Structures are given as structure tokens and as C-alpha cells.
Amino acid sequence: MRKNRGFSFSSKAVMMCCLAFLLIPASFAFAAPNKPFPQHTTYTSGSIKPNHVTQSAMDSSVKAKWDSWKSAYLKTAGTGKYYVKYQSNGDTVSEAHGYGMLATVIMAGYDGNAQTYFDGLYQYYKAHPSANNSKLMAWKQNSSFQNIEGADSATDGDMDIAYSLLLADKQWGSSGSINYLQAGKDIINAIMQSDVNQSQWTLRLGDWATDNTFKNATRPSDFMLNHLKAFQAATGDARWANVIDKTYTIINSLYSGYSSSTGLLPDFVVLSGSTYKPASADFLEGANDGSYDYNSCRTPWRIATDYLMTGDSRALNQLNQMNSWISAKVSGNPSNVKDGYKLNGTVTGSGGSGAFYAPFGVSAMTSSVNQNWLNSVWTKTAGSSNEGYYEDSIKLFSMIVMSGNWWTY
């Protein structure tokens, strides 16, 4: 048997190795993040953050929440792909996929594998196109990664995936193996084509919602105003301004007409004549379709984020009323927040949920009058245990925003 020979590197050999390394194509290397976590973004003047804990402590809490989320829900999906485990049986949905792509791009810098995860999530998205528009994502897959329950899209997943790609362009640039910016623009244009009702300039429920029953319906949890502004900035498509303006109009119409005492928004909205109103029971998902339930619980986070990032005050009255109502309703204790309310404030839920209390922390950031309430929501959220994919995702994003670590395109 031959004996191994020892290696000794001459200076020439070292130079050759270094030259070979430099000749490796850029597509095989990952870029250093331009906006590593934590970012400590300056939000709109007059807005607040929790002031009973240090910035370092908030950053550490977000890191811990991310580590827990990643361990529980971010999973491999074959070679070179990742997905977000939505249910214990292994099913996933495009909503979850969008959350995964957003979280990985935001946590880059702290998490050294963030770009690997992001690119793997992108490849999974590419492998599951909607049957109606191939740039959008089929909304649900089973544990074998096969499309189930219809291969069409859901608007919220489409929007988060597109927005995450814009952030990825800012985070890592688009000169590597994936042109993040172009991919994002492609999805944005597909959203305009298939997820926007261009006769009303409203967001559809998905690319499937074109018949008379659903074509004029919309879902307030999709009212991601800052996403819409980023879409316009990235593409230069002025039509996005129509969608932004109409979305704010609907928020204020619902607030003035149906929830002036609470500021709450319903899960689903329909057009009746020329008026947008809460959907009736069992419109799409269940008895609480016209109430503040498991879709619209995200609206304090989604809508308030645009105010924090841009200062756009068109929904500020609605947000302020909601902040005042909920803090009084629960006597300043987020543990008393229930998982469901009618728009008049009557409780419909039976218990507590992080999906409901955490987003109220984001909306509380609009004014210093909410400081004690915001501090309480932060403490409750940061100290919470795992509940499930949906609750834990919303808690993570709410904490990212509350800690001052959200940023935009």
C-alpha cells in the first residue's frame, strides 16, 4: 500500500491557488449584506419605540425569535430549495413562503446563511407557478411539494415575495446567480396584470378572483401600502398610485362607515353599489368574514408600517382610534386581547393569540400617548412561547418593526 505523501506549499503554489480562487465565477459566491441586521431605521418624526428596554436588548430578542422561528418552520425541500412548514402535516402556502423570504432578507448579517435560505426559497417559488400567471405562485402545496386545492395564487403571498426580492436587490445586489431586481419586477408586473382589478384599482383576493362574486372583493390584510409604493418606485408604473389611493380610500370608508368607535377592519370587503362594506358571513372562509378576525388581525402591522416608513397620514385617524380603543378595551394588558372582534368591539374570539396582540404594538408606535401600551405589547411578545407558524410569524415581524429594524426599498 502506498504511503501518503506530505504536502509543502511553495510561494508559487500559493499564488496559483489564490489566482484560481479569484477566477471562481461570482455566481458561486454570496455577497456581503449591505443592510445587515440590526439596522436601527429612523422612522417618521413623532413615532416611538419601546423605551423600557435597551436597543441592544430589543435586537437580542428579535434574534432569539428568529432563531426559534427558523428552527421550527424553515425546512429543506429537496436539493437547493427551502420552504416554510405551514402545518404539522408538512403543507405550505404562498403566504408562508412570502414570510420566509421577507424574514431571511431582513435577518441577513446576523444569520450568515440568510442568502442561502433566500435563494432556496426563491427556487421553490419558481418551481410552483400559478396556472393563471406563471410569475405568481400557486398558493398551496402538500408535504410532497405538489400543488393542492387549485394551482392559483393568493395576493398576499405574491406581494410579499415580490417585495422581498426588491429588498434582496438592496441587500446583496442583483449581479449574482439570481437577478433579484428583475425577478421582483416580473412579479410586480404580474400582480398588476392578475391580482389588481384595474376597473376599480383594488387588490383582488388572488389571480382566480375574476367572476362576479369575487372580482370586486378585497382583503384588508393585503393592504400593504409600503409594498405598493415600493412597487411603483421599482417599476415606474404610475398605475400603482391608483391602487395606493384607492386602498387608503377604502380604509377610511370602512372606518367612517362601520368602525368609527374602534378603527377595526374586517377580514373581507365587498363593493355594494358604490360603497365598500364588510363581507357577509361565509363569504369565503367562515362566519366571521365581516369581522376583525384571523386575516385582518394583521392590519395594524401592515397599515401602520407605511406611516412609520413614509409619514403618509391618510390612515392615521383610523390607526389612532384603534390604538385608543384596544388599549382601553383590555385595560392596557395585552394578555386580555381576544382572537376576534366584531367591528363594534364586541368579542367574538374565545382566547388569546399572538397574531392579535403583537400587531397592536406596531400601530401603537404612531404616537407617544401609546408609550405604556407599546411597552406592554413588546414585553408580552418578546417573552411569548411558540404558538404556531401563523402566530409566530406575525410576532416576529411585529418585533422587527417595533425594535426599529424594518427597512424599505
From Swiss-Prot:
EC number(s) for this protein? 3.2.1.73
Record has Hydrolase as a keyword: yes
**Reaction(s) the record says it catalyses:** Hydrolysis of (1->4)-beta-D-glucosidic linkages in beta-D-glucans containing (1->3)- and (1->4)-bonds
Q: What class of enzyme is it?
A: hydrolase
Q: Which InterPro entries match?
A: 6-hairpin_glycosidase_sf (IPR008928), 6hp_glycosidase-like_sf (IPR012341), Glyco_hydro_8 (IPR002037), Glyco_hydro_8_CS (IPR019834)
GO biological process terms, alphabetically, are: carbohydrate metabolic process
Q: Which Pfam families match?
A: Glyco_hydro_8
Active site (UniProt): 95 (proton donor), 156 (nucleophile)
Signal peptide limits: 1-31
Keywords, comma-separated and alphabetical? Glycosidase, Hydrolase, Signal
A molecular function GO annotation = licheninase activity
**What is the superkingdom listed in this entry's lineage?**
Bacteria
User: Per the similarity annotation, which family is this?
Assistant: Belongs to the glycosyl hydrolase 8 (cellulase D) family.
Name the UniProt record assigns to this protein: Beta-glucanase
Gene field: bgc
